[in-house]
Amino acid sequence: MRPEGITSYLLASPRTSSAEHLTTTLAVIQPGGEQRIHSHRPEQVYFILEGRGLMTVGSETQRVGPGDCIFIPSGQPHGLKNDGPLTLRYFSAAASAYEPGHLEKTWALKSEAETA
């Protein structure tokens, strides 16, 4: 878990599968945790599986919960804070795939983590 109270699991990506243009993740944010505001070139969608929070995209912040799907345009600053009492889980998909080196900064593969 990162200091912000979020754990991200890399699912399909060019690094882990034969996907060439897509990166998918499952993220878990503990109560009070947050994904800090950041931006990247790929477009992205978040699909909230459970829990509730505050999603910021650009200058707009909205309350999100189970079943909500949020589109994040390319280059748009965004982040998600779990301000509820329960764990927040979401699935994300980004396309095109992240630029070379981006994934290595964020996710260590299990074999790399075991040898580090």
Please name every model-derived segment.
Residues M1-L22, K105-A116:
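A short, N-terminal "cap"/entry segment at the start of jelly-roll beta-barrel domains
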Residues S8-S13, T25-H40, S74:
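Conserved short histidine dyad/triad with adjacent acidic residue
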Residues S8-Y9, M55-V57, L80, Y90:
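Short hydrophobic/aromatic-rich beta-strand segments that constitute the beta-sheet cores
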Residues T24-A27, F71, P85-H102:
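A short hydrophobic beta-strand segment most commonly corresponding to one strand
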Residues S59-S74:
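Short acidic-glycine-tyrosine-enriched beta hairpin
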